[in-house]
Amino acid sequence: MINHEVRTHRSAEEFPYEEHLAHKIARVAADPVEVAADTQEMIINRIIDNASVQAASVLRRPVSSARAMAQVRPVTDGRGASVFGLPGRYAAEWAALANGTAVRELDFHDTFLAAEYSHPGDNIPPILAAAQQAGKGGKDLIRGIATGYEIQVNLVRGMCLHEHKIDHVAHLGPSAAAGIGTLLDLDVDTIYQAIGQALHTTTATRQSRKGAISSWKAFAPAFAGKMSIEAVDRAMRGEGAPSPIWEGEDGVIAWLLSGLDHIYTIPLPAEGEAKRAILDTYTKEHSAEYQSQAPIDLARSMGEKLAAQGLDLRDVDSIVLHTSHHTHYVIGTGSNDPQKFDPDASRETLDHSIMYIFAVALEDRAWHHERSYAPERAHRRETIELWNKISTVEDPEWTRRYHSVDPAEKAFGARAVITFKDGTVVEDELAVADAHPLGARPFAREQYIQKFRTLAEGVVSEKEQDRFLDAAQRTHELEDLSELNIELDADILAKAPVIPEGLF
């Protein structure tokens, strides 16, 4: 890996085009390096993982709405892209929007956390849609996805967005554009222009994840994927981008991030170096913000222990979660969001409330992507009482481990201190989720398949499940990427909410 220093350059400075970060990323994307076998296997795992959460979310309103947007844009010339659940082909950028929304809706797919947050599986829907549009095969798709993960993960390692209240999809637009560039074997300059356009059109504020969180949380990465496809299309037609997009005097760093004098360090693979960043990412066993994965497992375990000791949760006086800066301020009481304690809050808000999540997991000693968020569950009187006794505090040691570059030390956990009214104190901690590569039950192919089977049950026919799993595990051999789509029976889709007509 090569560490690249990135800073603002005034327009009067000499700053060669080849030194622009977008150009360096484009060179990585254009590098025809082979994808290693373990990387390919993990990409296949994540294709399966995305399909799992699409199956679980397909009947939800935001996903049904996004699907309706794609359905009014059918393509009949043999091109286009597939939409999860549907037969036929649709405009690729709108298929990417529909599929991306389904992937993100339940907060249930993969994650990478460093200086910034990310869900790099969001790269897959736009890259797959572009591949289907262009008639590419599985080997090309895998190369494109490897690039998408590589670029997003390394931007996340080196450039914090949230401290300036910029949403993390600003790293996704460029990474998806770069991945599509790899997929299509585009030249460096075309990829460079596409990256610049994709970044320019996907910078947005973090209000999408603050306060009363709406369905836009699911649409945001899907929209970035749509923008990346359109950016590539324009660049292929010879259109340019604002440049230098990151380093310009009126660019992203100068006015949206840390300003004129700040230097970021972005690691990127050297020429000929394999793209392996996907191996540093991790998926979710539970449908909730990643920083709550270990606390959910901790709560389940502590719930069992408290019950075995005869301790009653109704006698709890307080619960304090000692955790990292990010966890405290994003999903904890450091956010100062009263909505995180509101039983009438949206599901999107509750899955960003570690207080709600820990209370329910502690009581139920389990977590379910639907039942744990049901309105009747959130309104349970004893849950509300327990929920309001929970707070978070930042612990410098957890913050240090969160940002550690040592995989053996990096952690996203918490220490829970439960104090009962009689003075009894019970505490425990968990550094990483059970499903984490270093956890109690690390996810491998078997677990990805089980997650798919579990979430697809009652939605996807068993025959279609078998067909998809066979195709997905042969992605590198596929010539027709429509095999990676899943079609649902009409009676299943009929259960989706009725969506009002839009403009189109």
UniProtKB/Swiss-Prot annotation:
| One of the GO BP terms on file | propionate metabolic process, methylcitrate cycle
Q: What is its EC number?
A: 4.2.1.79, 4.2.1.3
Which Pfam families does this entry report, sorted A to Z? Answer: MmgE_PrpD_C, MmgE_PrpD_N
> What GO molecular function annotation could you give as one example from this UniProt entry?
2-methylcitrate dehydratase activity
List the SUPFAM superfamilies hit by this protein, alphabetically: 2-methylcitrate dehydratase PrpD
Asked whether the UniProt record includes Lyase among its keywords, one would answer yes
Spell out the InterPro entries in the cross-references.
2-Methylcitrate_Dehydratase (IPR053420), MmgE/PrpD_sf (IPR036148), MmgE/PrpD_sf_1 (IPR042183), MmgE/PrpD_sf_2 (IPR042188), MmgE_PrpD (IPR005656), MmgE_PrpD_C (IPR045337), MmgE_PrpD_N (IPR045336)
Induction info reads: By propionate.
- Keywords for the protein's UniProt record, in alphabetical order: Lyase, Tricarboxylic acid cycle
Q: What does it catalyze?
A: (2S,3S)-2-methylcitrate = 2-methyl-cis-aconitate + H2O; citrate = D-threo-isocitrate
- Class of this enzyme: lyase
Query: Which pathway or pathways does this protein act in?
Result: Organic acid metabolism; propanoate degradation; Carbohydrate metabolism; tricarboxylic acid cycle; isocitrate from oxaloacetate: step 1/2
Output the superkingdom of the source species: Bacteria
Summary of subunit composition and partner proteins: Monomer.
The record's section on NCBIfam families has: PrpD_hiGCgrampos
Which family does the record assign?
Answer: Belongs to the PrpD family.
Q: What else is known?
A: The prpD2B2C2 operon is essential for growth on propionate as sole carbon source.
Q: What is this protein's function per UniProt? A: Involved in the catabolism of short chain fatty acids (SCFA) via the 2-methylcitrate cycle I (propionate degradation route). Catalyzes the dehydration of 2-methylcitrate (2-MC) to yield the cis isomer 2-methyl-aconitate. Could also catalyze the dehydration of citrate and the hydration of cis-aconitate.
UniProt name for this protein: 2-methylcitrate dehydratase 2
Species the sequence originates in: Corynebacterium glutamicum (strain ATCC 13032 / DSM 20300 / JCM 1318 / BCRC 11384 / CCUG 27702 / LMG 3730 / NBRC 12168 / NCIMB 10025 / NRRL B-2784 / 534)
